[in-house]
């Protein structure tokens, strides 16, 4: 789980159609010439704009923290002795999201607010829209969950529904 936790978000792009996959067999990748979309300087500028120019209210930062904490089931054998408001987490999750999810989610929320919604402030909806991408690969379901058809998506939706929006 530590390896997947290092990725900020997971986006499932699916597979190519079989006829496109067949083209990969003899494709000459050396002939591909990519043109950069952004210069290094522009990326540095955008990072500064997002970091300093997009506002994430402290109450929304706490909301992110509570959402991440709610993905973790109570475990008397560890230092995590808090019950999740989600019954799906308590019965189906073996391992919830780590604190790294908080860092990634807060940064991605700023990017999302600016690029997706053209806003200089993060709203709760931004956080909620990103939840499947930030949490999906960080929630490890137990055998009970798999046996009953529980999915990470269902757990995430329940966590979003159970944690009050500030």
PLM regions with names:
Residues 2-6, 23-24, 126-130:
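Alpha-helical scaffold elements adjacent to nucleotide-binding pockets in ATP/GTP-utilizing enzyme cores
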Residues 10-87, 115, 119-120, 124, ...:
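Conserved C-terminal "switch" segment of AAA+ ATPases
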Residues 77-166:
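C-terminal engagement/docking regions of AAA+ P-loop ATPases
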Residues 2, 59, 104:
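Short, well-structured alpha-helical interface segments that form or flank functional binding sites
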Residues 4-9, 136-137:
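Short glycine-/polar-rich loops that comprise or flank the Walker A/P-loop
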């Amino acid at each position: 789980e530590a390896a997947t936790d290092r990725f900020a978000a997971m986006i499932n792009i699916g597979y190519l159609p079989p006829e496109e996959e067949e083209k990969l067999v003899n494709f000459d990748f050396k002939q591909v010439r990519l043109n950069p979309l952004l210069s290094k300087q522009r990326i540095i500028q955008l990072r500064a704009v997002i970091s300093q120019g997009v506002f994430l209210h402290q109450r929304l930062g706490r909301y992110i923290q509570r959402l991440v904490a709610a993905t973790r089931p109570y475990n008397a054998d560890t230092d995590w002795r808090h019950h999740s408001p989600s019954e799906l987490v308590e019965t189906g999750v073996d391992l919830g999201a780590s604190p790294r999810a908080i860092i990634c989610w807060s940064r991605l929320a700023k990017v999302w607010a600016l690029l997706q919604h053209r806003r200089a402030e993060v709203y709760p909806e931004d956080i909620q829209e990103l939840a499947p991408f930030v949490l999906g690969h960080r929630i490890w379901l137990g055998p009970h969950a798999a046996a009953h058809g529980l999915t990470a998506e269902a757990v995430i939706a329940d966590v979003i529904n159970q944690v009050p929006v500030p």
